[in-house]
Amino acid sequence: MSSKTWDDDFVRQVPSFQWIIDQSLEDEVEAASLQVQEPADGVAIDGSLASFKLAIAPLEIGGVFDPPFDRVRWGSICDTVQQMVQQFTDRPLIPQAEMARMLYLDIPGSFVLEDEIDDWYPEDTSDGYGVSFAADEDHASDLKLASDSSNCEIEEVRVTGDTPKELTLGDRYMGIDEEFQTTNTDYDITLQIMNPIEHRVSRVIDTHCHPDNPDISTGPIYMERVSLARTEATSHSILPTHAYFDDSYHQALVENGDYSMDFDRIRLKQSDVDWYRDPDKYFQPKMNIGSAQRRVGTQKEVLTALKKRNADVPEMGDAINMKDTAKAIAKRFRSTFLNVDGEDCLRASMDVMTKCLEYHKKWGKHMDLQGVNVAAETDLCRYQHMLKSDVKPVVTDTLHLERAVAATITFHSKGVTSNFSPFFTACFEKLSLALKSRFIVPIGKISSLELKNVRLNNRYFLEADLSKFDKSQGELHLEFQREILLALGFPAPLTNWWSDFHRDSYLSDPHAKVGMSVSFQRRTGDAFTYFGNTLVTMAMIAYASDLSDCDCAIFSGDDSLIISKVKPVLDTDMFTSLFNMEIKVMDPSVPYVCSKFLVETEMGNLVSVPDPLREIQRLAKRKILRDEQMLRAHFVSFCDRMKFINQLDEKMITTLCHFVYLKYGKEKPWIFEEVRAALAAFSLYSENFLRFSDCYCTEGIRVYQMSDPVCKFKRTTEERKTDGDWFHNWKNPKFPGVLDKVYRTIGIYSSDCSTKELPVKRIGRLHEALERESLKLANDRRTTQRLKKKVDDYATGRGGLTSVDALLVKSHCETFKPSDLR
């Protein structure tokens, strides 16, 4: 590699999913094309120890490498890689160091860049003369003619004027010729594993009616490979204080320090919760980006959470006529959100009871009714309390000033919740049927934020943040909820009953030994939490704003977003004086709801993209138990949130960068590049579980690949020459040859066994099952004989018989025949 020093601004044009056209980079393309022919120095796969360290990156503990270094095997692998690179020149392969690493660690996967083949080998839709295959000597001349025509050089048309720079190809440019052929022309991957650089070139045509310069322009893009260091630097650039945050000892400081309480009335007992958190039981992330440790629900932590979440209720409301105001708010709710003011709901008032009865019948058929309490025998005014162990990501630079307080959950038992859930589920179904189409509540059948035919261009947004939402709800909120439920056809006795045991309640934490009385607050874990919070938010916004002109409104719990052609106006003083709520209208407001940004696609639909500042912190969670299944569960959840990440085009990415800049980075103009880097990291780590596990300090291959269980009694010692013997069992000492690797690459192994071997394999499984059954019978017979000897010794007075032995004798005598004791 030449000694040319890359310009920082030149290299940092990172992470885009399409090409950015920039004429100023043409000189760099010529320099890059000269560098392609030069070998990469420092990471040559030559079988040496230095190449092993750079390619495998082993752990060195006490002078011993993990995984161990086998010079003979490493040399054979390097030779195999070189032969494969020389043989397969017609398809793009992964870097040689990565190939050697996969072979040495027995990591399953393809050596061919299949994604790049799909992207850069367009399907021939012509008359079929692009590639010809000679079946006999008569077609030899046609093959030579086609080969000569394909090798002809095409004169490139250069730009003579200055073309204005565009940020997206979707609006103006259309690709007409995209090439991705060999490693010696368009595509170059250096063997520097930490920071390889890709070079891609594509010709595009300007589809805009430009009278001055309609010529074809060329331009490259330089993409920086995603790495943990780059991802961590991205987070530190956006949130600088997160780089110095480490709360490993915060729990110990809290428990061993003094604590002062400021409660009017609270009940305490001696708690026996152990606050120590064993770090060896959890995966440790490799990135330090502000993630908090798992919170333990000790008495001090619970008191701190109760102080912020339940105590110190604000009292900002004025004196009002409670019943008349509640009826007026409920009437405004019906006229704003429901068709024909909700008359359809009242006509079918018995649907709630009918659906609830059907649910209970279905539930009783497959559930054990033992342990289910009768609701009349349960104190419904008493709620259990617990502390959430997971702390939400912090998106502000305040980690050096205050410690985030964990959220709390107040809930009924499972039996009580199972009694009330069917009623509220049926009631919400009725609300969904009567709800106007421009109002969206993402729950049930509409469980996501992907909306069709909703435009964001030339629209105003209203994004409001309601602070202290749960504990600020008072008697007025309870009354107009009751009126709305009655209007939706909810049974009146249940409505009044539900309202009565929410007036005065008692919270009790059985582990932290803390008890506290509350009034009118939202219970964060009962059957009506999400539905009730959504109704409260909808009713307050409808009463304080005119929603008749809005194009779309989304409500989910305490989150809301209004999209309108006319700038919406919200009376914030009414929230303070009437609803006892602290509200903050974001200025400028962006399409952001439920910690997700809404971005418009080319077809006029909306897709949701998770907040990059929150998701990048979730890549370094500190509460995942050291278990492969737990880590895989977090990976599945991460993939579910990133299901639309690969559908983003350049226009959508640019729009998302502007949204993030308006919401978080008004003083950080460089946040555009960091958002692109974060999106590239999300796309990489959501591809497979192997890449996701690289974010945590794991034990290498043992985390994402488990060896197959080996039977103690093998049928035969002969090894099968199949795909699974070499690539699925990473402990196999025998390594495949070159031809086997070639077959692996081109996919000649359609299955582990051929058709002829299937009967043999079936017979082998039967033999193994018989051997296991025979071994089990032999062990049981031996145990029976041993117990018989103990019984005989006890009868003759030569030994004692314990109670455990007596039980074993009884169980074996019931299992085996008397002839088995002979």
Curated annotation (Swiss-Prot):
Domain RdRp catalytic: start-end pairs: 459-572
One Pfam family, please name it. Answer: RdRP_2
Q: What is its EC number?
A: 2.7.7.48
InterPro entries documented for this protein: BBMV_Gp1_N, Bromoviridae_RdRp, DNA/RNA_pol_sf, DNase_TatD-rel_CS, RNA-dep_RNA_pol_alsuvir, RNA-dir_pol_PSvirus
A GO molecular function held by the record = nucleotide binding
Its protein name is RNA-directed RNA polymerase 2a
Instruction: Please provide one cellular component term from the Gene Ontology annotations of this protein.
Output: host cell cytoplasm
Q: Describe the reaction catalysed, as an equation.
A: RNA(n) + a ribonucleoside 5'-triphosphate = RNA(n+1) + diphosphate
Cite the entry's keywords alphabetically: Nucleotide-binding, Nucleotidyltransferase, RNA-directed RNA polymerase, Transferase, Viral RNA replication
Q: How does it assemble?
A: Interacts with replication protein 1a.
Q: What biological-process terms (Gene Ontology) are attached? A: DNA-templated transcription; positive stranded viral RNA replication
